[in-house]
């Protein structure tokens, strides 16, 4: 896979800057299923959890037995270069990757990419609990307030910055704002100079925009966004 990735980069005449970029980690829910895969006359069952060898050994030690279970998620690693080169180079069938599993796979990915001339300068993922725990493991001994870590395989190169996926962050902010209000059970309210901002303010501003304002500002918003 990494040979294919390198050949794609060469075929596109990628500039040296294009070999630097970030890792995008995303885990998606899938429907549990078992299927046959035929390759070279050999049949193989696919659909089971298939993670790293370290993960398999850890599960055996924790459960005192070897378990075989259907995968419920697919974990994908994608390289995004600074010049726009995108390449999903590996994926795993999981039942929901833990923080420790993500930690092991992340550094393996960084190492393999470096072996083929690609340098990781940032890590991007959504705000799932396992991802936040993984981030805490990475930052545990750095004391960094900038969310950066050293590349353990090449400390002389640029640090690796950890960022949360923008779309997921904005969605989380939106969901929290939608739950804000003046009721006693509304505990999450945005504040600006000690003034609280409620969901009602956003809704009323939109209603004024579509009913009174002769030149509506938020033309892409609809009632479904608020009700």
Residue ranges and their predicted role:
Residues 18-21, 41-42, 73-75, 85-88, ...:
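Generic structural motif recognizing short loop/turn segments at the entrances and edges of beta-strands
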Residues 80, 85-92:
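Fold-level signal for large, globular catalytic cores of enzyme and receptor domains
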Residues 22-29, 79, 123-128, 168:
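Short, conserved catalytic/metal-binding motifs centered on acidic residues
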Residues 14-17, 68-73, 81-84, 114-117, ...:
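Intrinsically disordered, low-complexity regulatory regions enriched in Ser/Pro/Gly/Thr
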Residues 27, 31, 82, 112-113:
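Mid-sequence acidic-hydrophobic segments that form the walls
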Residues 66, 89-227:
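Non-catalytic regulatory appendages
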């Amino acid at each position: 896979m990494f040979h294919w990735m390198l050949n794609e980069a060469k075929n596109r005449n990628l500039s040296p800057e294009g070999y630097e970029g970030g890792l995008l980690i995303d885990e998606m829910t899938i429907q549990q299923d078992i299927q046959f895969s035929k390759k070279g006359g050999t049949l193989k069952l696919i659909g089971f959890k298939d993670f790293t060898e370290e993960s398999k050994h850890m599960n055996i030690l924790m459960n005192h037995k070897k378990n075989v279970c259907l995968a419920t998620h697919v974990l994908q690693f994608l390289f995004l270069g600074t010049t726009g080169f995108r390449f999903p180079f590996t994926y795993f069938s999981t039942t929901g990757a833990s923080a420790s599993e993500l930690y092991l796979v992340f550094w393996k990915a960084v190492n393999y990419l470096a072996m083929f001339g690609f340098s990781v300068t940032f890590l991007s993922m959504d705000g799932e609990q396992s991802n936040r725990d993984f981030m805490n493991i990475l930052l545990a001994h750095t004391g960094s307030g900038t969310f950066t870590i050293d590349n353990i395989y090449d400390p002389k190169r640029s640090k690796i910055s950890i960022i949360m996926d923008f779309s997921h962050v904005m969605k989380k902010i939106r969901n929290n704002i939608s739950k804000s209000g003046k009721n006693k059970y509304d505990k999450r309210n945005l504040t600006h100079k000690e003034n609280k901002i409620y969901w009602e303010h956003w809704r009323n501003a939109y209603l004024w925009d579509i009913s009174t304002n002769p030149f509506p500002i938020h033309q892409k918003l609809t009632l479904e966004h608020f009700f």
